[in-house]
Amino acid sequence: MKPEAHIEDIEFVPDRSLSLETGRIAKQADGSVVARLGDTMVLSTATLSDSVNESNFFPLTVDYREKFAAGGKVPGGFIKREGRPTDKETLTSRLIDRAIRPLFPDGFYHDVHVVNFVISAGQDFDADVIAGVGSSAALMLSGAPFAGPFAEVRVGRVDGDYIVNPTMQQTEESDIDLVVAGKEDALVMVEGEAEEISEESMIEALDVAHRSIRRLCEGQHRLVEQAGEPDPFEWEADRVPEQLVQRMREEYGPKVADHIHGPYSKETFHGGIGDLKDQAVDDVLGDASETPEGYTASDIRDAIGEVEKGEMRNMIVEEGKRIDGRDQTDVRDLWMEVGYLPRVHGSAIFTRGETQVLGSITLGTSDDVQPVDEVFADTDKSFYLHYRFPPFSVGEASYLRGPKRREIGHSMLAERALRPVIPEQDEFPYTIRINADVMESNGSSSMASVCAGSLALMDAGVPIEKPVAGIAMGLVQEDDETTVLTDILGQEDHLGDMDFKLTGTRDGITACQMDMKIEGLSRDVMLKALKQSRDARHHILDRMEETIAEPRAELSSHAPRLTKLTIDPDRIGAVIGPGGKVVKSVQEETNTEITVEEEEGVGIVTIAATNQRDAEAAIERIKQIVAVPEEGEDYVGTVKGIRDFGAFVEIMPEKTGLLHVSEIDYDYVENVEDYLEVGDKVKVHLLEVHDDGKMRLTRKPFVSEENGEQNE
């Protein structure tokens, strides 16, 4: 029997609707929804565990996967099955996770798993924001203690007009690409990139997004009404007992306050708080494992942590001071240096307080592009940034593994920040890779990576239009008091209510990422944070320009020199040769790297050399290969083979003609080897080129009839 499906069509902008369907598939999940926009469909499910996770954080897992079959494609490579998540899948999972996480209550420690499968991939709309709406609707139907709904939309701007959920073609033409998540009354997450837009334009984009978000949230409420309200999930909050927090505040609050107001460094701050926790455990427990009330050492430590949080937030709101002595708008001390690494193509150290990033540049050829094989796009990236956060940067002893979700997310954020100033390929035909290695971290290492990357690009001589800087903004909201913080420390990020990262040039914003720990952010606070970040960004740019004012005029001596030649596309095969034989031989002879490709009906040969002499040698060889022999012209060739009927003479690379025995001399030639040997240089005249490319040569014009010798 066909199950009954409940469908809600939501017109989020005039003449464009997103549909939500439940009850047809995946009914054993606690909540399941199929979200559809155009031909793109996403199955979103939400499942909750009955048991409590032993961790002391909310165990939320969000997965987003694009099935190649959804787009009528088969995965590339030897294994024809989807493997580990792609970067895009990881980034989309993070987008949804960051919107969901602040909407669950403190003390909820049951595992929550949200899964999104792209089951149909249309040609017009990407699936990422559709999955966000589906995830929210699935949670609404699951009975979870979820303070939703929320909705995600993409905002673009083409020719000055804002577009909600633009087509992929419109996104390509847009100067803004923002993903915005929010509830009916506030925004909870923002991420995206832009081409140096103003703070006012950013606010306009967010306003446009929020109008559609409200409609999508209202539609989710209607879907739940159709399907029936789910039974609420039964759970008990696992919070630090308020009586214990109050006791610790009375007994240790003054000590915590004194420590917070004292001299600051990351090590002394955390060490001192740790000592106070140890002291409290010893004082309260002694040799016992728990108190008569059942409080354990873990409970006592958590209670001191709550006291610390309260004291730090009160200090910020009431005194206008922060734990390191700065006021709300101060940027930490800066120092930076370029050219630190002698062998790389460009390098920079950027240090802000106790956060430090070493950036390095590698310039490569088109062989070094990053191929991207995805359901919605097959592209090649000629600019990419890799962020790495080794454990020693925070004083930890741990294992080095592959990139984690956070590292992939920070890599993309920094890459987006710099992308608008990267020159076009026709101006600077290099593949550019940035390594951003965190050396020390005490907050905002991704923004330090943007600054280090910008400095390193200029040190490498990459002709970027202007430098880019980044800053992380924070928020502390207590009752009616709201304080926006510039350049937040790690502890301010941990105990605060917002992490809002913004990057840009002097002329505007290039990228942003906002995460909330409370249920949302008002428009006025958002505008204040944007304007405050602009002042900080300009301050950092001033210091960066003191270090290096503009890109170096010359590339590093270790960087490849790229030269591009255009050739007839019909000659590409001649340059490459059978099995790559010809191009490999040219590379070996000239100590260069050569790539050959066709673009828009034109053959493009790119030569990478470390010096001008090698480049010129390779250029000459390529020109010889692609040159076309002309009838009536004279050539100096090399004898490649001898037969009874004549000799084969190579007059150009890979172009050999027949010098018939009758054309070697005016006299009768009985034995060709009496006149020519393999390897001899011989001057010939091209008599004829046949339709099949075969050439007929003669030596007679250069032979004296009297002595039978070739004239010089």
UniProtKB/Swiss-Prot annotation:
GO cellular component assignments: cytosol
Q: Which reaction does it catalyse?
A: RNA(n+1) + phosphate = RNA(n) + a ribonucleoside 5'-diphosphate
Q: What is its EC number?
A: 2.7.7.8
Per the database record, which ranges form the KH domain?
A: 560-622
Please give the biological process terms from Gene Ontology that the record holds: mRNA catabolic process; RNA processing
Which class of enzymes does this protein belong to? transferase
The molecular function terms of the Gene Ontology recorded here are:
3'-5'-RNA exonuclease activity; magnesium ion binding; polyribonucleotide nucleotidyltransferase activity; RNA binding
Check the record and name the Pfam families matching this protein.
KH_1, PNPase, RNase_PH, RNase_PH_C, S1
Q: Give the binding site residues for Mg(2+).
A: 493, 499
Keyword tags:
Cytoplasm, Magnesium, Metal-binding, Nucleotidyltransferase, RNA-binding, Transferase
InterPro entries linked? ExoRNase_PH_dom1, ExoRNase_PH_dom2, ExoRNase_PH_dom2_sf, KH_dom, KH_dom_type_1, KH_dom_type_1_sf, NA-bd_OB-fold, PNPase
- Enumerate the spans annotated as S1 motif domain: 632-700
Location relative to the cell: Cytoplasm
Q: Where is it predominantly found? A: cytoplasm
Similarity-based family: Belongs to the polyribonucleotide nucleotidyltransferase family.
Q: What is this protein called?
A: Polyribonucleotide nucleotidyltransferase
Q: What is the lineage of its organism?
A: Bacteria, Pseudomonadati, Rhodothermota, Rhodothermia, Rhodothermales
